[in-house]
Amino acid sequence: MVIGRHRNTRAIISLEAIKHNVATQISKLKDGQSLFAVVKANAYGHGMIPVAKAAKEAGANGFCVAIIDEGIALRESGIKDPILILGVNPASEAVCMAKHDLSVAVGTLEFLTEAQKLLQEEKQRLKIHLALDTGMGRIGFRNTEDLKEAVDFIEKHSDQLKCEGVFTHFSTADSKDPAYFEKQSQKFDELVGVLKKKPKYIHQANSATALWHPNFEGNLVRMGISMYGLNPSGDMIDETWNLEPALSLESELVAVKEVEAGSSIGYGATYTSSQSEWIGTVPIGYADGWLRRMQGFKVLIDGQYCEIVGRVCMDQFMVRLPKKYDLGTKVTLIGENNGKVITAQDVANYADTIHYEIMCNITERVPRIYK
């Protein structure tokens, strides 16, 4: 996708905030524990390479991605630290992953058997993190019998396969009710007990686990949403670490006009002015990730909350202004403006979603500006 460098719409990313959040998490680690920065999905929309380098500078020991190509991109950027692919990958890519020194999550014996043959042919060895499905229902071994069979296979073919880690993912670590979390934790302990030799990494802690369940098992934290300064629970549970949000989303007024009473605005004529009003146009739309359903939400202009009127268009939306503003006046969609703040959570609440999705939806057409 073409990046809109000649349009004054931009995502401002504070790498200092990233570093602060990573350093805060590191300060909470116990002796022998490490931190992997989760930079999948373009670092949750923040920009994978700059964020990864900032996290490394702050002390991150490695990285987590979702797909092979993300891992390769990190390697091509010069990063030599451990990289774990958390997603499912075809065994046909085993040699590719091994050659790029990428560790991979594995949750089936079928992957291991197919990958082993290919790795043997190419004289390569692949690092494995055994995924355990303790209740997420996504990927991983679900019972001790299947897990033991996989462990035995890896040990038998140690020239091609190395068990570097074992892990699970909690589905309710960000919930006020700890019951299901505790059930998953117990299941994890049961499954890990199958391993006669413990691998280098044993991990179950995502951002929410590290925040609200500090006595978690294992020696590795996978720091995801909290690295970007956002509360994993949204606004259900308070976070006390003073995380700093790293992303602001800004644009500007490119058209300002006064319309008379009875004027309709936007596709479908869904808004009609009740009196003479000043209307401003902002050059960002749903093609940039600003959802069409944000009609009626408010943005910040000169410290004033201004309502989005009419439907959000593909490339633009319109706002009702309290007065005439100059062209080029800054519009804040996420972030601070003259002492007022709109958070990613505010946007998510209005859109009936989560702030993860709001961040990831910001398309590549919006340039990321780093400071």
Curated annotation (Swiss-Prot):
SUPFAM superfamilies in the record:
Alanine racemase C-terminal domain-like, PLP-binding barrel
Sorted alphabetically, which keywords does the UniProt record give? Isomerase, Pyridoxal phosphate
Q: Does the keyword Isomerase apply?
A: yes
What InterPro entries does the database record attribute to this sequence?
Ala_racemase (IPR000821), Ala_racemase/Decarboxylase_C (IPR009006), Ala_racemase_C (IPR011079), Ala_racemase_N (IPR001608), Ala_racemase_pyridoxalP-BS (IPR020622), PLP-binding_barrel (IPR029066)
Q: Which residues carry this modification: N6-(pyridoxal phosphate)lysine?
A: K40
One GO biological-process annotation of the entry reads: peptidoglycan biosynthetic process
Q: Name one GO cellular component term.
A: cytosol
The GO terms this record gives for MF are: alanine racemase activity; pyridoxal phosphate binding
Name the catalytic site residues: K40 (proton acceptor), Y267 (proton acceptor)
| Pathway assignment | Amino-acid biosynthesis; D-alanine biosynthesis; D-alanine from L-alanine: step 1/1
Residues the record lists as binding substrate: R138, M314
The protein's matches in Pfam families, at most eight in alphabetical order, are given as: Ala_racemase_C, Ala_racemase_N
EC number from the UniProt entry: 5.1.1.1
- SMART domains per UniProt: Ala_racemase_C
Q: Which cofactor does it need?
A: pyridoxal 5'-phosphate
What family is it from? Belongs to the alanine racemase family.
Q: What does this protein do?
A: Catalyzes the interconversion of L-alanine and D-alanine. May also act on other amino acids.
- The molecule here is called Alanine racemase
- What is the species listed in this Swiss-Prot or TrEMBL entry? Ligilactobacillus salivarius (strain UCC118) (Lactobacillus salivarius)
Lineage from the top down? Bacteria, Bacillati, Bacillota, Bacilli, Lactobacillales
